[in-house]
Amino acid sequence: MNLRAFLLSAVAALVAVQAEVTYIDHDTVKPFPQPKPKTDSEKAAVKYKPQLLVSYGCHPYPAVQADGSVSAGLKGTGPAAGECGGSALGSQVYSRSDWYKDKWAIMYSWYLPKGRPAKYQRRHLWETAVVWIDDPSLANSTILGVSLNYGWRHKTMAPIESEFLDDSRVKLESYRGFSYPRPKLRFTTHVGETQDLITWEQLTVEAREALSNAEFDSGLIKTTRREMPLKDGVFEKRLKDAWPF
């Protein structure tokens, strides 16, 4: 297959996927209320839900609502936090958990409608943190380490230093990356905010399928680091990349 044919087939496949997803304005997406946790996995996800302090770029927004409608995001124009200083409908954090090797991994993901401002324009950005604990079924379970997405790499801390904890919650900051202007995560001693948590399993079928099929990577070269981190196939790879032990 020559290059022209390959590009045409790639564009056709992209259009087919996008046709299955309904996109709506980023500030009209309704978040899921945080359900009362029932399982050990859900209780641990709520217990260890991080605090997030936003010092640069967009605040977290819901990426999908119950009927499967997905955020269309924002062009990377204007100020870094322009038109994305927080949704009037409420914010959201997503999580998915599983055993990885001999540790329990809780992956948290925040959706930002604007990825890069100025000349690096890009819609959409997912910020991700993995909290590693010993066992979600234990009443006195313990954080063993935390991994943060950090550009192309992961920034890890195992064990986590106490100054970056507020009880059972790690304190994170979304700040301006030094190499080029885009939000990144780092540990902080400052108190942040929490968002309503919805786990991957608690999402409606429509919402889960929409997040799995939505196009969050507008670049020609596709990479899993820009895809929805919790979806099948990407979740497992991200856990492997984030392993800190």
UniProtKB/Swiss-Prot annotation:
Localization (cell): Secreted
Organism in which the protein naturally occurs: Phytophthora capsici
InterPro entries: NPP1
Leader sequence segment: 1-19
Keyword Signal: yes
Protein name: NLP effector protein Pc118551
Motif Hepta-peptide GHRHDWE motif mapped to chain: 121-127
Swiss-Prot/TrEMBL keywords: Glycoprotein, Secreted, Signal, Virulence
